[in-house]
Amino acid sequence: MNSTILLAQDAVSEGVGNPILNISVFVVFIIVTMTVVLRVGKSTSESTDFYTGGASFSGTQNGLAIAGDYLSAASFLGIVGAISLNGYDGFLYSIGFFVAWLVALLLVAEPLRNVGRFTMADVLSFRLRQKPVRVAAACGTLAVTLFYLIAQMAGAGSLVSVLLDIHEFKWQAVVVGIVGIVMIAYVLLGGMKGTTYVQMIKAVLLVGGVAIMTVLTFVKVSGGLTTLLNDAVEKHAASDYAATKGYDPTQILEPGLQYGATLTTQLDFISLALALCLGTAGLPHVLMRFYTVPTAKEARKSVTWAIVLIGAFYLMTLVLGYGAAALVGPDRVIAAPGAANAAAPLLAFELGGSIFMALISAVAFATVLAVVAGLAITASAAVGHDIYNAVIRNGQSTEAEQVRVSRITVVVIGLISIVLGILAMTQNVAFLVALAFAVAASANLPTILYSLYWKKFNTTGAVAAIYTGLISALLLIFLSPAVSGNDSAMVPGADWAIFPLKNPGLVSIPLAFIAGWIGTLVGKPDNMDDLAAEMEVRSLTGVGVEKAVDH
């Protein structure tokens, strides 16, 4: 992603809002949500409670929680900022994130809920050899989770830097550390049940807050969408930003400003689109939400509710993005601490002053906390349930032991994400999440689809698909311009970029599918026809799925 949506290296203070008011709203929100977590998360000693909340949520509740889990800092901060600077090309993120839900609904939501219990690996290993598949699946889960966590931590750093007018790197790092610590506390104290309620609260606040901002944006420009778009073009035309970049301001209304200049950028767009559209169906923290409802019917209802909320949200990001372009302007956005990631809070300030900015920013902060808590639960399940219980203890560990290992994992993964999030604070969060989607679509999706729909698929194919997708995606990201080779890279002073695309999906996703196919053909059959037949029946009917426990 080019420098237009990266943090300005010599950012100029925007000086908006009231830092004391902002931090006060944050503290109140943390106290309220922590109280909710403590009240609903008292019973988390058993693995069923800790990982899935006892599968006791209704479809409507879970739909709210899915929306809360999915609508991350990238969705709010990153996309609004990307649209404000790149126009239509920034909106491509909204389109990709939303279309991805149709893939998840059509291909994986119901069969995954019917076959699995706690984690993605439950499905992948159902008719294959447990240990190698669970280890591979856990590696894929942890890699995707870490990438996603890094994005949320970076978003938190950018957000609070704007709100508290913090410019020094060390204090921004402290902010990221505090977010990580609060996230760890949410998960340790509340498990999946506490985390789910936080996500439900956050979904209502976020969609409601964005709806209010959308209405106020139209009121502020005194017209409809056409007026808004014309104002955005005029603001770009008068900006130093457009003059420096050398583009026609009307380009913000059409495709190609960011991804249409060369063959490489066009291929990068295709790669990004593939990653976004296929990534959701392989995101472990989203897939895990299907296990928190008692039946497949409720799982389908969950996804329906989620699609309605998520679709409405992404339509409104179009208005907010162009609203930020028209009312704030690209010069002020790029000069703020956080650059593109600061566009939404700056727009809130223009619409309603310091108090409204504090409230919207608290919602954005809630977005970060809710998503990182869900990610931490997923990582803890991968280690506690898949590796410790199934591999190390051969399925003989007690539920209390699994939960203890999972809680230790939450602390470790939280600390790692804090460190990596600090290093990635200069990156646009939508771009970082797109990398997580690419890893998910490469490492997880091929194996999930093969497991559910190809009877001959075997352990060799599963392991080959996961590791090929995971390693190729990570290696190509490391060798891409996103990490080195230009001023906007993660390591701006170095240059080892030999892969031209910033997103690896175009190469790594097909590689994983091919590896799974070849591995199945050359590997030995698992001779588990009975389990394959049982899996097919369960995936279609839900027979044998664990019922919700009574709470």
Swiss-Prot record:
The chain crosses the membrane at residues 18-38, 63-83, 90-110, 144-164, 171-191, 203-223, 267-287, 307-327, 355-375, 411-431, 432-452, 463-483, 503-523. Disulfide bonds: none annotated. Its main location: membrane. It is found in: Cell membrane. Induction: Transcriptionally regulated by RamA and RamB. GO terms for cellular component: plasma membrane. GO terms for molecular function: acetate transmembrane transporter activity; symporter activity. GO terms for biological process: plasma membrane acetate transport. Coiled coil: none annotated. It comes from the Bacteria. The keyword Membrane applies. The keyword Transmembrane helix applies. Signal peptide: none annotated. It is a multi-pass membrane protein. Acts as a secondary carrier for acetate, propionate and pyruvate. Has high affinity for acetate and propionate and lower affinity for pyruvate. Driven by the electrochemical proton potential. This is Monocarboxylic acid transporter. It comes from Corynebacterium glutamicum (strain ATCC 13032 / DSM 20300 / JCM 1318 / BCRC 11384 / CCUG 27702 / LMG 3730 / NBRC 12168 / NCIMB 10025 / NRRL B-2784 / 534).
